[in-house]
Amino acid sequence: MVSSKELPPSTVPFFPNQFFRNQFRSKPQYPPPNTNLSEKVAIISGGNTGLGFEAATQLLSFKLGTLILAVRSTAKGEAAASKLRARYPKATIHVWKLDMSSYDSIQEFAGRVNTQLPRLDMVILNAGVSKLEFGTVSSTGHEETVQINYLSTALLAILLLPALKSKSPPGIPGRLTIVSAALTLVAKFPNRDESPLLPSFDNPKYWDPNDQYCSSKLLMHLFLWKLVDYISADDVIVNLADPGFVKGTELARDVSGGQRVGLSIFASLTGRNKKHGASTYVDAVVNKGKESHGGFIMSWQIHPYPTLLYTSEGQQITERLWDETLAEFEFANVRGIIESMKGN
């Protein structure tokens, strides 16, 4: 199969064409019924609610051996784990603290993976936010949506790469799926010409709640385009998965009033159910092979990246974003980690 980079950019309008095709004409793809994950170890961030919890349920239904729910609230995580343990008593289920708004917490979590897990097969980075009001994370000064959806997720992904490479069985690549969104295809990205780029997302003059969410997900596309040049699909398969528009999730938990009512009505008419939405994660991390490395999976199919990435402008932005992101993470030796992934 052809990878996302090798596909030509799509010329089909997202609204209404691709949106309604995604929501009503796409067929979910589940692992074969005899799939056995009994020896495997998986991590899901934000796995205590919504699509993360549903993805956990689906993996456990295929006899997943060990599951780690990476959650901000361990109390809520344990409540979710109790439900899963009751349903799947043969599985080993742990709850580990992970605060995606804290670089210290992210580093502590990755360190725990390195020291406490003898094996790691798959990771689904599902935690994300969609903020209605502008706000910043006190410890970093960055706007919350970009901090959680892009910066913190990118840092965690990089820190987990060595474990996915070294702790998966010989000859079997580790799997890393980062949850994305089809809305990247319509991101306006009004601050794309700013230099430096990342601080411009912290400027309220560019703030729009809808586009900030879209742009935060687009940043991960730009970053992954470059990152996979350093990672062999023989070591770790890294991809992006879009769950589609799903009803009943907590992504829009900060939405209130009339917007919440309108969104609920629209979701009831067009939204996928959680089972179908979460199956996109499971498909990406279990079904898809090396052809999905560095790819964007939308509606269970490998899809082109947003058009911007195929342009000279997009490539220039990618290089700027790459340099600024690695500089942001200098404290965590990410350059050394990324370089180490190129070795045998």
Curated annotation (Swiss-Prot):
Top-level EC class: oxidoreductase
Active site: Y213 (proton donor), K217 (lowers pka of active site tyr)
Gene3D superfamilies named among the record's database cross-references: NAD(P)-binding Rossmann-like Domain
Annotated binding of NADP(+), by residue: L51, K76, D99, N126, Y213, K217
UniProt-listed Enzyme Commission number(s): 1.1.1.-
Alphabetical keyword list: NADP, Oxidoreductase
SUPFAM superfamilies listed in its UniProt record: NAD(P)-binding Rossmann-fold domains (SSF51735)
Family, as annotated: Belongs to the short-chain dehydrogenases/reductases (SDR) family.
Function: Short chain dehydrogenase/reductase; part of the gene cluster that mediates the biosynthesis of the phthalide-terpenoid hybrid 11'-O-desmethylfendlerol. MfmJ seems not to be involved directly in the biosynthesis of 11'-O-desmethylfendlerol and its role has still to be determined. The biosynthesis of 11'-O-desmethylfendlerol begins with the NR-PKS mfmB that forms 3,5-dimethylorsellinic acid (DMOA), which is then transformed into the phthalide 5,7-dihydroxy-4-(hydroxymethyl)-6-methylphthalide by the cytochrome P450 monooxygenase mfmA and the hydrolase mfmC.
Name of the featured protein: Short chain dehydrogenase/reductase mfmJ
UniProt source species: Annulohypoxylon moriforme (Filamentous fungus)
Organismal lineage: Eukaryota, Fungi, Dikarya, Ascomycota, Pezizomycotina
